[in-house]
From Swiss-Prot:
Encoding gene, per UniProt annotation: ubiE
Protein's name in the database: Ubiquinone/menaquinone biosynthesis C-methyltransferase UbiE
UniProt GO MF annotations: 2-methoxy-6-polyprenyl-1,4-benzoquinol methyltransferase activity; demethylmenaquinone methyltransferase activity
Organism: Rickettsia peacockii (strain Rustic)
Pathway(s): Quinol/quinone metabolism; menaquinone biosynthesis; menaquinol from 1,4-dihydroxy-2-naphthoate: step 2/2; Cofactor biosynthesis; ubiquinone biosynthesis
Keyword Transferase annotated: yes
Keyword presence, Transferase: yes
GO BP: aerobic respiration; menaquinone biosynthetic process; methylation
Function in brief: Methyltransferase required for the conversion of demethylmenaquinol (DMKH2) to menaquinol (MKH2) and the conversion of 2-polyprenyl-6-methoxy-1,4-benzoquinol (DDMQH2) to 2-polyprenyl-3-methyl-6-methoxy-1,4-benzoquinol (DMQH2).
Length: 248
């Protein structure tokens, strides 16, 4: 039996996606609020830096694991302000999360040039060489087969297309590392219980972060998927990192 991690638990590979879906379906309506509380608002700064990695908004952009649409809607607003002709596809395997994204897009009057697709990052329903940019923020670690998702990213990007990934990473400095670990395992699940009524979902969250490969390990995985010019930039001392790469 093929096994993989669901947090610290070992589960059958075929069951992981359903378990992850349940986590996000159960917290979808509190997802944005929890992001603000857990990160003390820092996630907004991280995401602003992330979208700066996309200089050309006259582009076809695929946002995978789009969730409640934070990244895609930031890009859509920036493109509207610049009067750029952007084409954005928001893809997520969880329909409840995409519903949140659609609501936000309507509220912000940003629905134009947006497409919504329920799909797995491992099996994207798009032709080869379809997009100029592939973005994924805080989603890749939830994919059952990360290597397969990276190869799919490489497949759907045009030649010299750019892959950009924002993900929790490894803090290296001693005192900060210790504080971060304490905060993650003791404070975040408690906030999850108080606000979202779901401690287990946020225990999974911090466990999945703890198990995610280091910056350099993930860089090698991206390169092995077929990308070139692979690099990363640490933010907030390595709490998160922006990984980027290009297709041939």
């Amino acid at each position: 039996m093929n096994q993989t991690n669901f947090g610290f638990k070992k589960v059958d590979y075929t069951k992981k996606q359903g378990l992850v879906n349940n986590v996000f379906s159960n917290v979808a309506d509190k997802y944005d609020l929890m992001n603000d509380l857990m990160s003390l608002g820092l996630h907004r700064l991280w995401k602003d830096e992330f979208i700066r990695q996309i200089p050309n908004l006259n582009s076809h952009i695929l946002d995978v694991a789009s969730g409640s649409g934070d990244i895609a809607l930031k890009l859509a607003k920036k493109a509207r302000d610049r009067v750029n002709n952007i084409s954005l596809t928001l893809s997520d395997i969880n329909e409840e999360m995409l519903k949140q994204a659609k609501k936000k897009a309507i509220d912000l009057n940003l629905f134009q040039n947006l497409k919504f697709t329920v799909a797995s990052a491992e099996e994207l329903p798009f032709l080869d060489d379809s997009f100029d940019y592939y973005t994924i923020a805080f989603g890749i670690r939830n994919v059952p087969d990360i290597n397969k998702a990276l190869k799919e990213a490489c497949r759907v990007l045009k030649p010299m297309g750019k892959f950009i990934c924002l993900e929790f990473s490894k803090v290296k400095e001693g005192y900060m590392k210790d504080f971060y670990k304490f905060y993650s395992f003791n404070i975040i699940p408690s906030i999850g219980q108080m606000i979202a009524g779901n401690k287990e979902a946020y225990e999974y969250l911090v466990e999945s972060i703890d198990l995610f490969p280091s910056q350099d390990e993930f860089r090698i995985m991206i390169k092995d998927a077929g990308f070139e010019e692979v690099g990363y930039k640490n933010l907030s001392g390595g709490i998160v990192a922006i990984h980027s790469a290009y297709t041939r």
